[in-house]
Amino acid sequence: MKDIRIAIDGPASSGKSTVAKIIAKNLGYTYLDTGAMYRSATYLALQNGLTEENVPEILDQLSQNPISFGKAADGSPKVYVGDVDITHPIRDNQVTNNVSWVAAIPEVRQELVSQQQRIAQEGGIIMDGRDIGTVVLPDAELKIFMIASVDERAERRYKENIEKGIPADLETLKKEIAERDYKDSHREVSPLRPAEDAITFDTTGVSIDGVVEFIQEKAKKIIDKG
């Protein structure tokens, strides 16, 4: 048996993070939330009043406040910039609606990708994001590209927000997700697209358990081959 690298890509609210966390726990792998890293960079930019015109300053903030991951007492993941816990603030709508322009800055992506690649060198890791299989881990042993309808993804985000006590409007979420899809798939740097050797999986109408089972079966076949 060997520890492999699993890359899960897909558009906003396609269920990537939820599935990746469960699989990481089941396989005893490390879960690296790349989306949280870009959200953290966005959070730092917004907190300091920075825009796409302030790239050097954003890079300075990332250097002064390194992003790290930890675990809460119940095992749930925590995200920090410096020593500040920003696990919940980075999920706010303001961060969500600004992350695309931050993630499109080449220098920011380059810095975060190099950090992700270093962490993944040993294997036994699962990452989810927009360009894991195409840019971050092009040689990952398993690549999955998850998709789902805009309506279903908006419903998922709506339920998540309500459960977390975040105000939400379903029609607004549908519009925001459709706009995010367009931005992510049309940006010049690392546009959202499946890797040539990725398995595309439409999760519309499929339960979380069903998605987890599908991906784990693929992973175990590769692991067992050694």
Curated annotation (Swiss-Prot):
The keyword Methyltransferase does not apply. One of its GO terms (cellular component) is cytosol. It catalyses: CMP + ATP = CDP + ADP; dCMP + ATP = dCDP + ADP. Its EC number is 2.7.4.25. ATP binds at residues 10-18. InterPro entries: Cytidylate_kin, Cytidylate_kinase_dom, P-loop_NTPase. It is found in: Cytoplasm. CDD domains: CMPK. Coiled coil: none annotated. Its main location: cytoplasm. Belongs to the cytidylate kinase family. Type 1 subfamily. This is Cytidylate kinase. It comes from Streptococcus thermophilus (strain ATCC BAA-250 / LMG 18311). The lineage of its organism: Bacteria, Bacillati, Bacillota, Bacilli, Lactobacillales. The gene is cmk.
